[in-house]
């Protein structure tokens, strides 16, 4: 199972055979820093075009300000503007969905998880992007993966999932 946390940034975790995969020295699954567009927006990591700059609270707010010259106070305000049908907010959300779908495609084709579970504060707005995201992922992945790969919202439970995985691992 892959867990992607959609919040201020975009984080990730991978639980494989009951163990949390955290890479060499605990730095695995920095999924938000996988490049989506090489010449894209500057990321907080210093690189350009990271997926996080397209789908995260900070990414949405920064890109909204770049496009409109107006700053928003929160991701909730960004999603409220989407609910009201604001064109710029809608375009940015759709670009974010594409970036996130491409990231998921890469993860599915690389590690073949049974599930990708989305957690974090942005999942509270799943009704605005969840179906589009699932449909786009289905379009992008190999047909065999479509038959069993589940794309699910998990709510704002990323910390709980991470702690549980660490506890399971430490018991062994």
Regions found by a protein language model. Give the residues of each.
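Glycine-rich phosphate-binding loop of actin/hexokinase-like ATP-binding domains
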Residues: 1-54
């Amino acid at each position: 199972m892959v867990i992607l946390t959609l919040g201020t940034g975009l984080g990730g975790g991978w639980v494989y055979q009951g163990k949390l995969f955290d890479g060499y020295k605990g730095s695995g699954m920095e999924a938000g820093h996988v490049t989506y567009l090489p010449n894209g927006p500057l990321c907080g990591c210093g690189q350009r075009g990271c997926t996080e700059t397209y789908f995260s609270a900070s990414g949405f707010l920064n890109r909204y300000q770049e496009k409109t010259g107006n700053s928003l106070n929160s991701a909730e305000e960004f999603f409220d503007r989407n609910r009201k049908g604001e064109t710029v907010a809608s375009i940015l959300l759709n670009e974010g969905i594409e970036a996130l779908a491409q990231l998921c495609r890469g993860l599915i084709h690389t590690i073949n998880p049974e599930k990708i579970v989305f957690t974090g504060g942005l999942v509270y707005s799943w009704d605005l992007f969840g179906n589009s995201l699932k449909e786009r992922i289905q379009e992008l992945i190999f047909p065999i993966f479509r038959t069993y790969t589940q794309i699910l919202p998990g709510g704002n439970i990323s910390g709980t999932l991470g702690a549980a995985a660490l506890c399971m691992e430490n018991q062994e």
